[in-house]
C-alpha cells in the first residue's frame, strides 16, 4: 500500500470481507461483475488458454499478453477515456499484462471457515478472546461438538431442558433421539450452531471495551486474593498463570481497538486468491508443465466448496450429518492452503512430497520476504566475514582496503579531481586501479566524515543494523568491537555482515544521530544494557584480575611460595619509589611505577603488591581488626588488614594507606578511569 505521504509500505493483518471483495471485483461495460473464482481449472488442454472463471482466468486477473484479449484482438493501450477498455466478446480488459502480478480474485465459501493462523498458532488469538480452551474450540470448529445458540426473548428447548453443565456439548448428549429429520433441521437452524459459524457468532457478540474492563477487574481481584507467605504454591502458580493470561487478553483487545480490526474477521467467508504470476504454471522441456503447489491446494478448496454448494442447493433432503462432514472437509482444505501440516500429517502429492502452503512460501530464510524483498542486492554495499577488533572504539569498525576503495570510489574520484591530482574521471580511475599512495590518503579523508551501516541477517530488531565510523585495516575481514556483537546476535565463528554506505545527507544525519553503536547501549525491548562483556571478554577479565585465592594468608602458611618475583636474589633491592624483597610484597607509590616494574619483568601481572592510595577513610572499616601489626624502631607501625595496610605515626595519626592489589587490577582500573574521563570530557563539550 501507499500512504498519504507517498511512502510505499507493507501492512499485514486481518481485513474485512468487503475489503477482499473490493480488491478483486471488476465491473464490465455490460454490468457484469467478475472477480469470483468458481472453477478449479487452470488451462484448457487443447488450446492452452486459461479457463473462464478458473484460477488463471483473463477476465479476473487480466490478459496474459499486454493489449491482447482472449479472442486474440489487439488494441493499443492508451490513456484516453473514449477508448473502450474491455473486449465486448470475452470481457478481458485491454491493459498491461503486469496486472497479473497484483490483481487478486476470491472464492466465495459456502460455509464460514476459521483462519488457522488465529486458531492454531500459539498464542491462539481466538481462544484468548473467547476465554476458552483450544481443545474445545477445535472440537467446535471441526464439527465434533455443537454450540447452544442463545435466542433472545424466546423460550428454547435447550434452555427449558436445563441439563447442560457446559455451553459446548456433544451431539450425542444434546439431541434427543425422538427428533425426526424434519424436526431436527428446524431445531438445528434455530438453536444449534456448529463449525466456524459458532465461533463467528461468539466473536461478533464481543464488546472489546467491556472485555478489557472485566479482565482488569478480575486481574485486580486475583492480586488481592493471593495466598500470603506462599502457603499454597500450587494455587499461587495457578493464579499467576491466570493473571498472565488476562494481561495478554487485555493487550490483544487493545490491539484490535487501536487498529480498527473486528474480531469476527478472523473467520473467513471470502478466501482471497493470489495473483497468477505469484503461483505460475510454466512449460519445461518435453511439453510438460510445472505448477506451483498453491494451485493444487486452491483446486482442492474449490472442489470441496462446490460439492458443499451442491449439497446445500440442489439436494434439500441431504442429511445434516453429511453437510457437516463436507463443511469439515472445506475447513481442512483451507487449513492446508494456509498452513500445511499445522494439524498433524501434512498433505502430500503423488510422489510423497509435501505441498508448500502459503505459510511455507512466505516464512523462513527462503521465503518471499527474506529472500525476495529483503535479500536484494543493492549498490554501494559489500559483504565480508567479521573478526574481532579489540583495539577499536565502540563506534568504529575496521573496513578492508579492498572493500573501502570500491564503496567510496565515487567520493574518491571527486576528491582526486577537486585536489587537482586528476584532471578527469578516466585519470582518477587509473590512479585508483594502480593504487597510488595519494589514493589512500584521499580515501582516509573521505571516510573520516562518512559513516557506514553494518547489518547482520536476520534483522529481527532495530539493533540488527547500526552505524559505525570506518577506518582502513589490512586483510579482507571487517573488524568489529566485541561489545556490539550482542545487538547483532553475532559471534566470531564465521559470521558475515553486510556494509552499506548512506548517500544522502538525510541518511547520514540519521545514522549519526540515531544509529551509532555508542548511542544504542540499551535493549529497546526491556531496557537492560545490551553492550556487556561476554564469553572471551569475561574470561580475559577474570584472568587479568584474579590473584591468589588465599590472599594475604598465603605467605603466612606457605613460606616456600612467598617468592612472587622473578628476582631470586635474597638481597634487598631499593629504589627511590619502591622497595621489595623476596619474602615481602613490594610497595609502590603510584600505578605507573607498578606497571613499569611489570614491563621490566621484575614482577608478574598477578603478583600481589601494595599500592599507595589516597587518604580515603571509606577504605577503612571501623569493625575490622588488623591481622598483624608491625612496629618500627622510630615508633611508627603498620596495621595490616586483609585488603589494605595503614601506616600510623607515634601519635596514631594515619600517614599513608596502601591497598593490596596486582598489576592486572591496576591496568583494568586505569582503562575504566580513562573511559570515564573521556565520557565526562565529551559530555562537557556537548553542554
Curated annotation (Swiss-Prot):
Cofactor(s) essential for the protein: Mg(2+); Zn(2+)
Primary site of residence: plastid
Binding sites annotated in the UniProt record for Mg(2+): 491, 493, 495
Places the protein is found: Plastid, Chloroplast
GO cellular component, one term: chloroplast
Enzyme's top EC category: transferase
UniProt-listed Enzyme Commission number(s): 2.7.7.6
Protein name: DNA-directed RNA polymerase subunit beta'
Lineage: Eukaryota, Viridiplantae, Streptophyta, Embryophyta, Tracheophyta
Gene: rpoC1
Amino acid at each position: 500500500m501507499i500512504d498519504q505521504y507517498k511512502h510505499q509500505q507493507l501492512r499485514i493483518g486481518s481485513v474485512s470481507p468487503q475489503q477482499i471483495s473490493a480488491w478483486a471485483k471488476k465491473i464490465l461495460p455490460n454490468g457484469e461483475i467478475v472477480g469470483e473464482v468458481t472453477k478449479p481449472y487452470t488451462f484448457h488442454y487443447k488450446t492452452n488458454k486459461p479457463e473462464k472463471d478458473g484460477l488463471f482466468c483473463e477476465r479476473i486477473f487480466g490478459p496474459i499478453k499486454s493489449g491482447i484479449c482472449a479472442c486474440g484482438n489487439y488494441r493499443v493501450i492508451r490513456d484516453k477515456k473514449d477508448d473502450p477498455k474491455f473486449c465486448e466478446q470475452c470481457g478481458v480488459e485491454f491493459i498491461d499484462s503486469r496486472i497479473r502480478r497484483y490483481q487478486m480474485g476470491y472464492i466465495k465459501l459456502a460455509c464460514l471457515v476459521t483462519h488457522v493462523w488465529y486458531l492454531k498458532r500459539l498464542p491462539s488469538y481466538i481462544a484468548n478472546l473467547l476465554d476458552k480452551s483450544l481443545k474445545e474450540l477445535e472440537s467446535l470448529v471441526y464439527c465434533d461438538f455443537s454450540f447452544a445458540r442463545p435466542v433472545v426473548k424466546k423460550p428454547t428447548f435447550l434452555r427449558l431442558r436445563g441439563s447442560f453443565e457446559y455451553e459446548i456439548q456433544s451431539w450425542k448428549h444434546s439431541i434427543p433421539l425422538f427428533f425426526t429429520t424434519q424436526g431436527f433441521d428446524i431445531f438445528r437452524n434455530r438453536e444449534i450452531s456448529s463449525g466456524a459459524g459458532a465461533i463467528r457468532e461468539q466473536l461478533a457478540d464481543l464488546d472489546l471495551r467491556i472485555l478489557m474492563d472485566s479482565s482488569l477487574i478480575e486481574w485486580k481481584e486475583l492480586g488481592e486474593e493471593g495466598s500470603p507467605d506462599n502457603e499454597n504454591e500450587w494455587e499461587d502458580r495457578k493464579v499467576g498463570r491466570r493473571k498472565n493470561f488476562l494481561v495478554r487478553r487485555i493487550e490483544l483487545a487493545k490491539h484490535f481497538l487501536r487498529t480498527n480490526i473486528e474480531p469476527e474477521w478472523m473467520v473467513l467467508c471470502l478466501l482471497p486468491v493470489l495473483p497468477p504470476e505469484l503461483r505460475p504454471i510454466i512449460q519445461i522441456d518435453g511439453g510438460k508443465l510445472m505448477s506451483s503447489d498453491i494451485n493444487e491446494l486452491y483446486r482442492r478448496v474449490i472442489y470441496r466448496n462446490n460439492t458443499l454448494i451442491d449439497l446445500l442447493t440442489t439436494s434439500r433432503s441431504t442429511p445434516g450429518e453429511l453437510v457437516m462432514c463436507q463443511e469439515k472437509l472445506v475447513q481442512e482444505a483451507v487449513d492446508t492452503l494456509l498452513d500445511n501440516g499445522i494439524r498433524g500429517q501434512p498433505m502430500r502429492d503423488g510422489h510423497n512430497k509435501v505441498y508448500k502452503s502459503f505459510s511455507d512460501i512466505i516464512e523462513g530464510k527462503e521465503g518471499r520476504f527474506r529472500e525476495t524483498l529483503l535479500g536484494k542486492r543493492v549498490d554501494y554495499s559489500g559483504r565480508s566475514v567479521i573478526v574481532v577488533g579489540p583495539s577499536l572504539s565502540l563506534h568504529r569498525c575496521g573496513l578492508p582496503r579492498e572493500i573501502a576503495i570500491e564503496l567510496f570510489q565515487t567520493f574518491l574520484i571527486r576528491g582526486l579531481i577537486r585536489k587537482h591530482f586528476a584532471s578527469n574521471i578516466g585519470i582518477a580511475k587509473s590512479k585508483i586501479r594502480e593504487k597510488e599512495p595519494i589514493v589512500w590518503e584521499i580515501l582516509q579523508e573521505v571516510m573520516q566524515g562518512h559513516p557506514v551501516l553494518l547489518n547482520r541477517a536476520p534483522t529481527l530488531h532495530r539493533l540488527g543494523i547500526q552505524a559505525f565510523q570506518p577506518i582502513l585495516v589490512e586483510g579482507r575481514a571487517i573488524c568489529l568491537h566485541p561489545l556490539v556483537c550482542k545487538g547483532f546476535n553475532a559471534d566470531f565463528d564465521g559470521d558475515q555482515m553486510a556494509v552499506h554506505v548512506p548517500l544522502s545527507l538525510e541518511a547520514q544525519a540519521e545514522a549519526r544521530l540515531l544509529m551509532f553503536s555508542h548511542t544504542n547501549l540499551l535493549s529497546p525491548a526491556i531496557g537492560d544494557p545490551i553492550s556487556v562483556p561476554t564469553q572471551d571478554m569475561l574470561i580475559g577479565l577474570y584472568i587479568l584480575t584474579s590473584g591468589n585465592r588465599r590472599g594475604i594468608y598465603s605467605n603466612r602458611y606457605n613460606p616456600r611460595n612467598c617468592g612472587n618475583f622473578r628476582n631470586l636474589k635474597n638481597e634487598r633491592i631499593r629504589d627511590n619509589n619502591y622497595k621489595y624483597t623476596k619474602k615481602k610484597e613490594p610497595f609502590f607509590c603510584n600505578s605507573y611505577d607498578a606497571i613499569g616494574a611489570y614491563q621490566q619483568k621484575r614482577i608478574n601481572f598477578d603478583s600481589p603488591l601494595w599500592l599507595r592510595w589516597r587518604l580515603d577513610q571509606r577504605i577503612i572499616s571501623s569493625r575490622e581488626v588488623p591481622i598483624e601489626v608491625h612496629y618500627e624502631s622510630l615508633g611508627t607501625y603498620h596495621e595490616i588488614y586483609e585488603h589494605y595496610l595503614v601506616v600510623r605515626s607515634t601519635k596514631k595519626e594515619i600517614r599513608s594507606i596502601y591497598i593490596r592489589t596486582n598489576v592486572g587490577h591496576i591496568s583494568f582500573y586505569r582503562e575504566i578511569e580513562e573511559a570515564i574521563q573521556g565520557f565526562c570530557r565529551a559530555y562537557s563539550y556537548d553542554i
